[in-house]
Amino acid sequence: MAYNRLGSPQRDGPYSPSAQPQYDSRSPSPGRPLQPYIHPDEAYARQQPLHLQMPTASDDRLAMQPTYSVENVHNPQAYGQQYGQHLPDSGDMGYGRNDYIVSPEEHHDAYYTQPYSPHPQGDYALDPYPSHDEPYRPDTDNVPILQPDSAYGPDPHTQPGMDYDDYQEEPRPTPSPAPIRRWKTVKEVQLFNGNLVLDCPVPPKLLANVPHAKPPERDEFTHMRYSAATCDPSDFHNERFTLRQRLFAKPRQTELFIVVTMYNEDEFLFARTMIGVFKNIEFMCNRSSSKTWGKEAWKKIVVCIVSDGRAKINPRTRAVLAGLGVYQDGIAKQQVNGKDVTAHIYEYTTQVGLELKGTQVSLKPRSATPVQLLFCLKEKNQKKINSHRWFFQAFGRVLDPNICVLIDAGTKPGKDSIYQLWKAFDLEPMCGGACGEIKVMLDHGKKLLNPLVATQNFEYKMSNILDKPLESAFGFISVLPGAFSAYRYVALQNDKNGVGPLEKYFKGETMHADAGVFTANMYLAEDRILCFELVSKRNCRWILQYVKSATGETDVPDRIPEFVLQRRRWLNGSFFAAVYAVAHVYQLWRSDHSFLRKLMFLIEFTYQTINMLFAWFAIGNFFLVFRLLTASLGTKETLGTAGTVLGVVFEFVYLGTLLYCFILSMGNRPQGNPKSYMMMVIFWSVLMVWLTFASIFLTVKSIETEVQQKDFSFSTIFNNSTFFGLIVSLASTYVLWFVASFLFFDPWHMFTCFLQYIVLTPTYINVLNIYAFCNTHDITWGTKGDDKAEKLPSANVKPGGKVDVLIPQDDGDLNAQYDSELKKFATKPPKEVKAPNPADKQEDYYKSFRSNVVTAWMITNFILVAAVLNIAGFDRINVHDTQQQNSTIYLAVILWSVAGLSLFRFTGACWFLVVRMVSLEIWSVCKV
């Protein structure tokens, strides 16, 4: 394995003999071999680019970054001064360029340290080399570290009119006669273009378990890079932030850029996802015959982890990240030079793997394949779409990847699924996006015992067997699941006017405050908007594909309240996004798709419009089917009076449950009324069993009726409208499901989940749809309030342009901190008991009482009206036409009741007058 040196003082450095043969005869110093000579009182003038042959060292060498380093080098003044001479001036920053290894002048502007002349610009005597035996000497603030004309700006002490007498410097540590440790950290570093960027040594305990460069050499395995981003994601590049992949002697080209977005997932869910990602990278590294991949494939892959809020991240998950080496506590800052930090960015190439033993996460040192990790810890909780902004707009612009893979924490990709997604783009140049099969995590089938999980498993399977392949055949998939999908980075880019897929996609982050309800609900399914905008992109012809061989496993809700809340967002977002796509179908004609492809798109959108109409009228259609089937059971040929009575009972309970569902959905949280929702689910399940029985019973009765006829033939059976309608509808759904499942060699869900799905179908139609449409005003993403994170120290600029950084001081501190993080997930977490918020509990109680009162009020009034008017089933029970008679009697009762009540009130009023008159008379007598 080739190690990527950060700039050894002895090998591959710009001061080494290999870089400058003319200095090969110089004798090494006792302190630091071949250390350049620096006079302490005068900074060197800016050097002219040297037209020399660049060193023939490894392309993976990282350039020395003096102002980034938090290590106590022997001559920090010269160290920073040297870097000041090579400060990048161009705005290009080397992004997307590959010729720096050939052109020293251009590479000079990409943070690479050029060969350095050891001669000072003045006639000062040369200082001797610093020695390890010297005691600690603090920096002198009145000596400029950088050139007056450097990009950091002139030294404040040289500015006329600047007074720093009021500045109180922190006390310096007492000088110690002990030798300086090489890895001893310092408290002061220079800001780089106003940005705080640190190269921090990783704990020696971690290094002891992985291959790495031996001291005094440094590589990407020995140091973690921290950047305190103080800007919006869209300004990350313009603020001259960069990433480690662009700092190698030959900047690495990123073929695969993988993002794992998380909120507060525990260490088990996070490790499950990362294990799947690591296995995919290892799989690609083992493809020795591939032209793209192979042994060094890991250098073309960057794994980005974006956590939505520093106060929200699970501490045990953060400890796992520290175990991997991509996080260190105590380094992050709240502010830098008065600017709030928006994201904390940690970079490290880890060789530590993860493994799961049950639900216990443990580290697996000396992993065969290194992985380039980029951990972005956002300061505030700003939703998942903001996490994607950091991924696409900030980091994507720097790395310029080919393919971007999106994964949610908790989703476990198959061992080669990411490769299969990449392969789809490689085989089809016009593939702009792709998705794999989302599977339900069943825990070896144990979770199928929960009917709700089994139903969702069936739903996912049939979607991946019927819906996704159909849409992929047309070239447009209505939604690429954000849990596991991939996009071609160039296909997502906006045009020169800033209009394009990403512009539409990210509009949902800031528009909720002033957008209409329709638009806000539409952006609950922002991934659907992205898919449509990608296919209809102006002057392009991108298509979307489904990759059956790429799989990702995920958990699904196993309780009714969580299930209802999840589907509320899905249903509202998908419905309004579908309306948007149908209304903007004309945009397809501005693309460069062929006429045949556009015609196929129109056919697909027509199909989706029909599906949307069926979804809109699903509740009405279901009631009509129920009404017709129950009415058919009341005939003499079927169940007679018993069927009629059962039909009336079911109809009353049906309408009452439907009404109760509306009332609950209008103002109650599912978490506050779990028993009520469970009762509704049970009723709809019983009703579906009744309807299934009715369908089978009517079919059998129809066949018996035809068989009993003298002129019976098989053709007469199909002439029976009842039989023919039932058979055609059942065969076109259930039978085709079986056939399609066998064609895809994936039929097992038909045997393990089919019945559960059939029984819970009314719940999907009634409960989920009613709750979704009754809560279209709720445009939240399920993101809870932003908790206040623990305040971090700030990095304030001191005279001389330096800031204080308080980090672990030595190996012992680093190891102690590392051990502390490992202990956080070394044992099983205590069982989490969610204590209900007292305020929420009281509010749920009040809302539940209100809903029950309103329900009782409406149902009793409905029964009264139905009984009097002989409707809602009473007309079927009472065969005589008694509607007029009942109405007359009821009207008479009402009139006499009104008269009686009026007479009663009149009597009371008269009695009041009598009492009043008598009282007045008595009062007058007594007064006299």
Curated annotation (Swiss-Prot):
Disruption phenotype: Leads to dramatically altered cell morphologies when CHS1 is also disrupted. Does not affect virulence when solely disrupted but the virulence is drastically reduced in a mouse model of acute infection in a doucble CHS2-CHS3 disruptant. Leads to increased expression of the other chitin synthase genes for compensation. Residues 1-45, 110-179 are annotated as: Disordered. Residues 130-140 have a biased composition (Basic and acidic residues). GO terms for cellular component: cell septum; plasma membrane. Its EC number is 2.4.1.16. It comes from the Eukaryota. Residues 17-28 have a biased composition (Polar residues). Glycans are attached at residues 286, 720, 886. GO terms for biological process: cell wall organization; chitin biosynthetic process. It is a multi-pass membrane protein. Keywords: Cell membrane, Cell wall biogenesis/degradation, Glycoprotein, Glycosyltransferase, Membrane, Transferase, Transmembrane, Transmembrane helix, Virulence. It catalyses: [(1->4)-N-acetyl-beta-D-glucosaminyl](n) + UDP-N-acetyl-alpha-D-glucosamine = [(1->4)-N-acetyl-beta-D-glucosaminyl](n+1) + UDP + H(+). Polymerizes chitin, a structural polymer of the cell wall and septum, by transferring the sugar moiety of UDP-GlcNAc to the non-reducing end of the growing chitin polymer. CHS2 plays a synergistic role to CHS1 in normal yeast cell reproductive growth, even if this role is less predominant than for CHS1. With CHS3, plays an important role in virulence. This is Chitin synthase 2. The lineage of its organism: Eukaryota, Fungi, Dikarya, Ascomycota, Pezizomycotina. The gene is CHS2.
